[in-house]
């Protein structure tokens, strides 16, 4: 989906495996090392819920992303960040694991 502004157009799309390095780098720029998800975490997130992992690009550069699974669990708990077992598209709850925007 293209988003037109007065200046440069933006593209909003679902993330793919080709985005892993850029997503990991942006996460590292936005969060302290103890809190930032690593490449392997993003890899399983993409495999588990790619259809709920969105990236925003400007001039071909990834500048922002948001991701999180749908689940049957009402509350976000720490264990969700470490295991794809909570992913369930038949659930009623959309979790947000992270939002990162280029500084």
Listing of model-derived features with the role each one plays in the protein:
Residues 1-5:
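Short acidic N-proximal helix/loop "leader" segments that mark the beginning
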Residues 6-9, 62, 90:
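A short, polar/charged loop/turn motif at coil->beta-strand junctions and beta-hairpin connectors
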Residues 10-23:
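A short beta-loop-alpha structural element at the N-terminal edge
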Residues 14, 44-47, 55:
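Short secondary-structure boundary/capping segments within folded domains
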Residues 15, 99-101:
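Hydrophobic adenine-recognition pocket in adenosine-nucleotide-binding enzymes
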Residues 24, 28-49, 75-80:
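Conserved GNAT-fold acetyl-CoA-binding loop/helix
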Residues 52-69, 102:
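Conserved beta-hairpin
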Residues 66-99:
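Conserved acyl-donor/pantetheine-binding loop and adjacent beta-alpha core of acyl/acetyltransferases
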């Amino acid at each position: 989906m293209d988003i037109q502004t007065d200046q440069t157009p933006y593209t909003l799309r679902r993330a793919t495996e080709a985005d892993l390095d850029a997503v990991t780098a942006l996460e590292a720029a936005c969060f302290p090392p103890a809190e930032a998800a690593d490449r392997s975490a993003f890899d399983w997130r993409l495999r588990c819920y790619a259809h709920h992992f969105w990236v925003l690009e400007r001039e071909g550069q990834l500048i922002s992303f948001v991701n999180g699974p749908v689940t049957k669990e009402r509350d976000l708990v720490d264990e969700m960040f470490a295991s794809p077992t909570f992913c369930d598209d038949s659930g009623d709850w959309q979790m947000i694991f992270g939002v990162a925007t280029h500084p």
